[in-house]
Amino acid sequence: MTRFFADRTRLLRTAFAFVLMLFILPFGFSEKISDRDFGFSLDVPEGFEVADYTTDGMSYFFSHPNIPVTLVMKICNEPSSRAKDVLKKNLEKLSAKGDTDSFLWNQTPCGISSFTMTLDDNYFGWGVTAPLKIQDYYVLLLCYAPENQKGCEQFIISTINSLCIDAEYLNTPGIITSYAFPSEGKKSVLLTIGGKKIQTSIDKSDLEAAKFTIDLEYAVLNLYANHKLWKEAWQRYYRMIYRDNAGRIQTAAGDIYNELYPELRLKTPQDADIKYAQALLSWVQTFNYERAANSKESDFTSIPASISGKGSDCDSRSMLISILLNYAGLDSAILISREYSHAVVVTDIPAPGQTFTMENGREYLIGETTAKVTWGMIAQDHADRTKWIPVTFNE
């Protein structure tokens, strides 16, 4: 990997330990920050507050009441400029030090930098720039913390990594992860679903990159264990994993769909959706069960690792099915439960059985991934709908 901050990239791949304490927030964001005019969004960790903004609405400063991290979001009008140059120009205005690099994120030229600067204190942080859908406009993100608060780096990376500049690429790896883990070439994967052999592939970097994202987001999630926004933080944790991991198995999702669905539609067109969903459910029910040996690590097995044969638990399996069904145009989500320590998959396929009422008012069919049962069945001791939290992925 030839990157200007190879040492920083090695740090990215290392789990950091937060030494900060979170207390109850008086107010803070628990939903996405979005701009409809320019078409971008940020799914930042819970609790950020607007500290300041410009009257033209083009610059915002966000602070966090419990974590010493500042986020600057600026819309820049820079005709005939490159993303890298826009970032460099703005860092120079702050007398910030650090190299700036350019790279392609979803085929779009972007700028990235890790920097240090001195304002009222000494700070370190990350910055990115990316072009927006309106020509000659860029979004600039700077996220930083005091130099003596290195434990904040995961929080900073997670914040910037949540940027989306095009809804078409919502569920693809984030901007920093994409920079740190460039493609290394295809790796073959052989799947057996419903008795059929399906040859597919992932990228050689996907296992390491997906695990990095999981470790990163798990560190952020742990900050909210006793927080009043724990539920929202938990939902975000799974959204961030889905976004990264779904993008890594799009080839596999297509290969699975093309091998199974057309034949089902030809034989029984009226039942093709539920039969396809059942083939996927029966497949993951055969996976080996595995949880993290270390309680400090996430139990979540990455989706690329799951389809490569590594053991998994209920949440990994549920997310895998959700990715595959969403790829097929069959809306799907997962349900998670703190009380049951369990996860299930749900889908908007009309069929008999147990359902869960989603926020859109529709009844989604429940799928249990760890017991060998059909769609629409759930254990009686897991049937209290108030104990389940929905996590949706296509918003």
Role assignments for model-derived ranges:
Residues I193-T251:
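Secretory-pathway-linked proteins and extracytosolic
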Residues F40, F48-E49, L141-Y179:
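Surface-exposed amphipathic alpha-helical segments
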Residues F4-F16:
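Bacterial N-terminal signal peptides that target proteins for export
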Residues S316-E395:
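Hydrophobic/aromatic-rich core segments of domains that either
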Residues E31-D56:
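N-terminal "mature-domain start" segment
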Residues A15-I24:
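Bacterial N-terminal signal peptides
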Residues Y53-L140, N148:
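Conserved polar/disulfide-associated segments of primarily extracytoplasmic proteins
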Residues Y238-G309, T370:
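Secondary-structure boundary elements
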